[in-house]
């Protein structure tokens, strides 16, 4: 609980009654306003929260903090129905720091690890929380699948929540007993200053490939957004995938000011020239997962993991390097790695006797689809099937690229609907089809359930069917409505 006057120096503008206002929470949604809350009205990309100030007051908000475009209005107080309205210049940019102060700097009261990159964020965040929990911690996670203590995750609307949601969630996790948290840090979250005030004990870079160009416009802008986690924010340990060209470049740049940057590679021939490093020296893929021999500046060892896919080698090594950087004992890590389990919708394998093997994966970018298909091929002794689509109201440029990848790596391709949102599914399909050299060989089935059913009825034992794009999602967005839909449920229905 915070007093209004403890947050800003505005005593002289308030009478004794308003000086004693006690606030219990910060909120952005006026519909959730109630007594004891500070309603925050920011100028968003789609909605201007200032238009809902009166609704928040009517619902019981005890005070309002709103964004002003005029620097001379900064921290001036006005009143509406005896409720104080505090103007704040460039509020969006400073909201993370305000929420940090309001919730007593929660990121400094536990071990927080941030994960950024195009692919792998969810798997790495989940593995960090899972592994530390196995080692005796109470761990939390925030990201694409949802937020909460590990094993008690609730669905979230964005990969990286609002500045307020992040700080309030961390505070809540601590009150629930958490001492470790892993958070997926999206490029949007970095550009929009949502993680600005966080103290990261470690930050991980996974990789960079085409995604979100509808927002960032260029790959250079996209890369610079990701780099902010390491170059501009409070990040103690920096763990980089140097097999990625951007990661290798950042290693050189960041090492100039921080000699402890950690280089991670899946290549046995990688020659580290940094103080801290970890690399795979031998890999073995089998039906039960992957075995990884590694060498590192902390020592050598063997990891046996149930995770499938070459890119999960990189994910697991990045997790291992992070925990070693944080001081975890290498012996305890190697002794517990077998207890790790896969992540929902991330190369999730479903099988039944005398049926094709099905892999459900979240792959929705060209690079992710290529990785998923190459990984699926390792476990395929027959035909490799690929079912995919592309989301509506998103980057159109990646659609033909994904088609070309599906055609190159799969034996049979079915193009279906993903989340068309408000875009015409037929237009999405036409964009995709331009990427095929022989589109006549491709099956087009808009209804996603029918597409999955067709593949499962056609595929035979020893075939592998990759269902890409939705992963953990249990919904399909058509228009502006979310309908219940789960790839996994459909597979089990027709198995």
Swiss-Prot record:
The modification N6-carboxylysine is found at residue 226. It catalyses: UDP-N-acetyl-alpha-D-muramoyl-L-alanyl-D-glutamate + meso-2,6-diaminopimelate + ATP = UDP-N-acetyl-alpha-D-muramoyl-L-alanyl-gamma-D-glutamyl-meso-2,6-diaminopimelate + ADP + phosphate + H(+). GO terms for molecular function: ATP binding; magnesium ion binding; UDP-N-acetylmuramoylalanyl-D-glutamate-2,6-diaminopimelate ligase activity. A motif (Meso-diaminopimelate recognition motif) lies at residues 418-421. UDP-N-acetyl-alpha-D-muramoyl-L-alanyl-D-glutamate binds at residues 28, 30, 45-47, 158-160, 186, 192, 194. The keyword Transferase does not apply. Belongs to the MurCDEF family. MurE subfamily. This is UDP-N-acetylmuramoyl-L-alanyl-D-glutamate--2,6-diaminopimelate ligase. It comes from Histophilus somni (strain 129Pt) (Haemophilus somnus).
